[in-house]
Amino acid sequence: MGAVLGACTAASCAANLACCCGSAACSLCCNFCPTCKNSTSTRIVYSIFLLFGLVVSCIVLAPGIRHKLNQIPYLCEHASETCDSIVGYLAVYRVCFGLAAFFLLFCLLMYGVTSSRDVRSKIQNGFWGIKILLFLGAIVAAFFIPQGKFSEVWMYFGLIGSFLFILIQLVLLVDFAHTWNSSWVGRMEESGSKVWAVLLLCATFLMYGFCVAGIVCLYVYFTYSQESSCHTNKFFISFNLILCIIASVLAIHPKVQERLPTSGLLQASVISLYTVYLTWSALSFQPDKNCNGFYETHITLAGMDSQAIIGVILMFVMVVYASVRTASSSQVGKLGMSSPKHSSALDKETTVLSEGDETRSDVGLVEEGGEGRRVYDDEDGGVAYSYSFYHFMLMLASLYIMMTLTNWYKPVGSDFSKLQYSETAVWVKIASSWLCQLIYIWTLLAPALFPDRDFS
């Protein structure tokens, strides 16, 4: 009897494991969630993979974990005195390498998928048990890579990837601001209430208030020094301030409003605040300690600081936003996150089977109970988003996590025995802040400069 019960238990566990390897895993994850699309639930699961990598990276920065990692010979072979503070950064490099390799693999594997009938579409939306093992295996395998030049080379990959992710993050922020503005304006027009207009004005003034406060703090902490004139920092702050003013003026210019009625100060305030954040983030790692009010703080503070916390929170919020925002008319869709063949299907009303109706397939409509909570297939007419580009974005997000959690430090020497501020990191962030503003200004000017072209 015991053997029979044991066999039944094993069979039950095997069945449950097999279920997790199929497409039904997403629907099982959404058992307690409202009705959602299969494509959305899939992206949320991949976002959870990224969140897991972020959590693991934060954990390995903890002092207790560092002590355990110190026992791995090649990690601390030459670091000696500073190993206790460095090994955490090495671990983050390796965790994020495994994370990036996992998403890069799926980015290449899913390249060119345009139909849900493609066998690779089944891989994208299913086999979650195998993916979990592959995901964990990639992270563990990264710890067995010989040190050599790994840290130095991988840091430059991180700089490039972080720069690209900052630009993608800008597009997501612009789309978020447009959506926010359109939503509140629409509610104001529907209800006829001025409450929404007041809220819109308050949000805009609040954003600009943070911008002004941020600019003042930048001048106080990064330009005042008795030993140095800090001309470079003054130029960075002043130039970005001018760009913010230009963008704000253009956003409400009559010619721009005529061709782009959706533009407004709310969007400009969000982009301006993001520019101030990037400027602060860049100047915080200025190698000249005479012109860096946070120099001593960053040198003595191990692990995450306020800038890293803000960075990773903003990053993850934007990734989740990209996971649920797929309309082809949005900036997310124009970025490549939405499939053109699927755009018409997104505008049609999707009918969800009621209780008692027959489900179509494992990846079709999935009934989740009598309360109407279920995951339904929205990719019959084609894929709802670019699988490859979504994984590419997550790969860049992994590199951004790595650089943010390691404070954009530059390893000196192949043994990572010394850390220093990187002038390259400063210029990467400053250049990204300029490019962000220039891209936004171009989106305002282009419809007015080229009226014959469709920029809707």
Swiss-Prot record:
Its Gene Ontology cellular component terms are: endoplasmic reticulum membrane; membrane
Q: What organism does the record attribute this protein to?
A: Nematostella vectensis
PANTHER family, per the entry: SERINE INCORPORATOR, SERINE INCORPORATOR, ISOFORM F
The UniProt transmembrane annotation reads 10-32, 44-64, 95-115, 126-146, 153-173, 195-215, 234-254, 265-285, 301-321, 383-403, 430-450
One Pfam match, given by its short name, reads Serinc
- GO BP: phospholipid biosynthetic process
Put simply, this protein is called: Probable serine incorporator
Member of which family? Belongs to the TDE1 family.
Q: Where does the UniProt entry say this protein principally localizes?
A: endoplasmic reticulum
The membrane-topology field of this record reads: Multi-pass membrane protein
Q: Which UniProt keywords are present, listed alphabetically?
A: Endoplasmic reticulum, Lipid biosynthesis, Lipid metabolism, Membrane, Phospholipid biosynthesis, Phospholipid metabolism, Transmembrane, Transmembrane helix
Superkingdom as given in the UniProt entry: Eukaryota
Matching entries from InterPro entries are given as: TDE1/TMS (IPR005016)
Function as written in the Swiss-Prot or TrEMBL entry: Enhances the incorporation of serine into phosphatidylserine and sphingolipids.
Q: Where in the cell is it found?
A: Endoplasmic reticulum membrane
